[in-house]
Regions:
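A conserved beta-strand-loop-helix scaffold within acyl/acetyltransferase catalytic domains
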Residues: 3-49, 53-66, 111-114, 132-137, ...
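Acyl-donor binding region in acyl/amide transferases
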Residues: 66-160
């Protein structure tokens, strides 16, 4: 099969490719480059019969003496089951990196090493978990290692990696793959979590709301400032969150919980 590697792919074409791909991350969309403005970027891909089959949004950072770092957040965007295409894509990517003075290509692919229920981790509940994302993980990691990538290991420190190792998600399907009804989904939550849903806390003065207005970022920042002072840490700025709201106008949502102190007490 004949393949063609291209750089400088039109952002609209690449965005369509990413959005139509079965499993990928928002960090591979062109919108993410609007947030990471301190980095240069490019969209590259491998075509088969004029169809894009492998792709990557590359973030480029200038280092010393004209050298660069290539970082592909939550990429590549590919199914990993076409060994020939993956091999050619990586080979051409390395050539492109070398030509542009990159001394390292860092990737953190959107693949999952393991899946479990938080109740199993906390209390060893023995809850059966439907495996969705970990079916071929070992094979994919081995393929990438064979192509020259070095696995970063499994460190537990929060700042050990560019992106967090752990992702919390609520499964909307049962172990057989069927979507939960609303009340069924609610029953999957721990009891103390269920208490926060519905009238139980509303009657006690706790109210939940959401907003897509970036002017409300100031309310988020006021809470983050309290967290920074309490934990002695530094979190993201108001400017950063407003960038997110601008870059993802149809997807970025702010969620708030507010307490009526007089009623709650």
């Amino acid at each position: 099969m004949k393949y063609q590697f291209k750089t400088g792919i039109d952002s609209k074409e690449y965005d369509k490719f990413v959005r139509n791909f079965p499993s990928t991350s928002f960090m591979q969309t062109p919108a993410w480059s609007l947030v990471k403005t301190a980095w240069d970027n490019d969209y590259v891909g491998l075509y088969s019969d004029k169809k894009l089959v492998c792709g990557a949004m590359i973030l480029k950072r200038n280092l010393f003496l004209g050298k660069k770092l290539f970082y592909i957040p939550r990429g590549f965007v590919t199914s990993y089951d076409n060994d020939e295409a993956l091999k050619i894509f990586v080979k051409e990517l390395k050539k492109y990196a070398k030509k542009n003075g990159a001394i390292d290509i860092k990737i953190d692919p959107f693949i999952c090493f393991s899946e479990d229920n938080i109740q199993n981790i906390k209390k060893n509940k023995g809850i059966e978990v439907r495996k969705t994302f970990t079916l071929d993980t070992d094979k994919i990691v081995k393929k990438l290692e064979n192509l020259g990538f070095v696995h970063g290991g499994f460190k537990k420190e929060v700042n050990a990696y560019i992106q967090p190792r752990y992702t919390m998600a609520i499964s909307l399907r049962d172990k057989d793959g069927n979507f939960y009804e609303k009340e069924e989904l609610r029953r999957t939550f721990p009891k103390n979590t269920r208490n926060y849903i519905g009238k139980y806390h509303e009657d006690r003065g706790v109210y939940f709301s959401y907003s897509t207005n970036k002017e409300d970022v100031k309310d988020l920042i006021s809470v983050l400032n309290c967290t920074e002072e309490r934990q002695h840490i530094a979190l993201r700025s108001e400017k950063y969150f407003k960038k997110l709201m601008d870059a993802f106008p149809d997807n970025a949502v702010l969620f708030f919980a507010r307490v009526d102190i007089d009623k709650y007490i």
